[in-house]
A protein has these predicted regions:
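Structured catalytic-domain cores with a bias toward divalent-metal coordination
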Residues: 2-416
Length: 416
């Protein structure tokens, strides 16, 4: 009997070690599916590699629009900062040329580092689409770099470590809410001390993550982690204790412009989540039947991920929902464009994305063990939100151009 127990124990240990070895190999060799469509050089001209250059080119494109339409407003909002005196949200507003019926709001950079791609899409929209659009009854508001600090310093969050897309609320109750699921995972999500990629915890991060998936399920974990939390100021996905300066600054602009229109349609541009090389249409769950039907009309022929399946999650304090709450008299249509980068809809892609976020946040708050760790971590995060692949960049612009061109025509038919 003793011999049998020893054999069984050896087998169990072998199975466990084999599983750890297999998942470690899978994790360490994971790469997202490559975009095979060749890059078009015409699409690449819209990309720049710094906040300052993106802002400069956004303004240049806006100035061209100013020559095409009447009463165009090109302006900026200075965002208060203890670190940098030159952080601005820039915007271009083209009013409906004859009768104000519908307004499009195309916003970018809510998650700072995602602003590179958002800026490129906005530049393309102005250069290739807006100049040829009929704006007799439709106005357009382009908001560039909603989180200029995160954009400039390659962070997803603001200077106060606030996730701007978890911060937006006109109800103080949000900032006092408790995400119990997040608290249960706090130690895993927010490790202390200098970050070292060679530590056992980081080298075998996927083992801990898979254990949590088995314990809670992927859907439950994803929701608990990503929906937002308001208890831990240095933690991931912190939504803040009050409205961030960026949101306070843009709110009166949104109210002032939107009040002239019966129908307001917001597209907020993001990168990161989902299949690499795919443009996902990703709103929060919608119960209003007319609103859902109108979105399906606007994006006819395109798949909409309604945020109510196992692969997706909902958030609290998001920017698109906030706009609707501050303009209650308007018929408001929200949508999020998410350009997938790391195949985060897969288990390994999701784990890699989370690990990237954890070590970047740990390094920012507690420093890095070595310069090599710092360089590798920051490079990985930038790649996750702004892929270096020219094929990926070109396809992102092409997909955006096709969908925006079609949806703008469909939007013209929407009535309150």
């Amino acid at each position: 009997m003793k011999k049998i127990l020893i054999i069984v124990s050896i087998l169990l240990v072998s199975i466990v070690l084999g599983a750890i070895g297999f998942t470690t190999f899978q994790y360490n060799t994971f790469t997202p599916v490559a975009v095979m469509q060749d890059a078009d050089s015409k699409n690449l001209v819209y990309f720049q590699n710094s906040y300052d250059e993106c802002r400069k080119n956004f303004i240049l494109s806006a100035n061209k629009i100013n020559k095409k339409f009447q009463k165009v407003t090109i302006s900026k909002l200075k965002i208060e900062s203890k670190k940098d005196p030159d952080l601005t949200i820039n915007y271009c507003y083209v009013p409906a040329q004859k009768k104000s019926k519908r307004l499009l709001i195309l916003s970018s950079g809510v998650h700072g580092i995602e602003g590179y791609v958002g800026s490129a899409v906005q530049q393309m929209f102005m250069e290739d689409l807006l100049v040829n659009m009929n704006l007799s009854e439709m106005g357009v508001l382009l908001i560039h770099g909603m989180n200029p600090y995160g954009f400039k310093y390659n962070r997803r969050v603001t200077e106060n470590n606030v996730d701007l897309n978890r911060n937006c609320s006109n109800d103080i109750k949000l900032y006092k809410s408790i995400n119990a699921g997040y608290s249960d995972l706090y130690t895993m999500l927010n490790p202390k001390g200098e970050v070292s990629l060679k530590s056992v915890k980081n080298m075998f991060f996927q083992v801990n993550a898979i254990q949590k998936i088995i314990q809670y399920s992927m859907g439950t974990l994803r929701q608990a982690i990503l929906q937002g939390q308001y208890q831990y100021p240095e933690g991931l996905y912190f939504g803040g204790n009050e409205l961030e300066p960026s949101i306070r600054a843009i709110t009166p602009v949104l109210k002032q412009i939107a009040k002239n229109y019966a129908v307001v349609f917001n597209i907020d541009l993001h990168t990161g989540y989902g299949a690499r090389g795919t443009l996902h249409l990703f709103p929060n769950p919608i119960n209003d039947k007319k609103l859902k039907n109108d979105l399906e009309t606007i994006f006819s022929g395109n798949h909409i991920d309604w945020g109510d399946g196992d692969d997706f999650y909902t958030v609290t304090g998001d920017f698109t929902s906030y706009i609707g709450r501050i303009i209650p008299k308007q018929y408001y249509i929200p949508m999020v464009f998410e350009f997938g980068t790391l195949d985060s809809q897969t288990t390994m892609g999701s784990i890699r994305s989370l690990h990237n976020m954890i070590v970047e946040n740990q390094g920012f708050h507690h420093n890095y063990k070595t310069e090599k760790d710092e360089t590798k971590i920051n490079k990985g995060v930038l790649e996750m939100y702004y892929p270096s692949s020219e094929n990926w960049k070109s396809k992102a612009i092409e997909d955006a151009k096709i969908i925006l061109s079609k949806s703008m025509k469909q939007f013209q038919s929407i009535e309150r």
